[in-house]
Amino acid sequence: MTDNTVKALGRAYGIMAAQLPNIVGTPCRVQMANQWPLRGLGDGMRYMISNRKLTPEVDRAIRDALDGVDDMDEDMQALPIVQQGMWELAYMQGRCAKILSDGEYLRERLKAKGLTMEQAAEACEVSKAAVHSWCAGIKPIPQVRRELLAERLGILI
C-alpha cells in the first residue's frame, strides 16, 4: 500500500471517528484501523450507516479524503511501523477536520479552482446573487444547479 493511500485512509477514518467517538473512536478500534486500514474503513462505514451518521456532508468529506487513492490492497500482515505513524498523523487531521455545509464546500471548491462567483453563475445560468446566497448558506443549491456545477466546472456537491 502506498503512503498516499495510507494517509487518505487515516484521514477518512479520523472523519468517521469525529462523528462517532464512542464507537469508531475507541482506542481498540483506532489501533485496529491503524494496523489494518481497509478493515478499519469498512468497519467505520458500517457503524456510520447503522447509526445514521453518514449525512451527505460527512459522505462528501470522506469522498474527498479518499480522492486520488490509487491502490487499496491489504495483505494479512499489519502495516509497517513507519506507515502506521503516517496513518496516525492523517487520522488526527481527519479527526479535527471541519465538515463543510454545501455552501461552504462550494465556496472552498471555487477558491481551489481559481474561479469567481461570476464564472459559477455563468456556468449555472443564474445571477451572481444566487451563487452568493448558496455560498452564504441562505438558500440551498437546487439539484439542477448541482448537476450543472458537476458537469461544467467539475464540482461535485
Annotate each language-model stretch with its function.
Residues G40, S101-Y105, V126:
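Alpha-helix N-cap/N′ positions at the starts of helices
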Residues M1-A97:
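Intrinsic-disorder/low-complexity detector
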Residues M92-K113:
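A short, Lys/Arg-rich alpha-helix, primarily the initiator
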Residues L110, A121, A150:
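The alpha-helix within a helix-turn-helix
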Residues Q143-I157:
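DNA major-groove recognition helix of helix-turn-helix/homeodomain DNA-binding modules
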Residues G114-S133:
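Short alpha-helical DNA-recognition segment
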Residues A136-I138:
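Residue-level detection of the helix-turn-helix DNA-binding "recognition helix"
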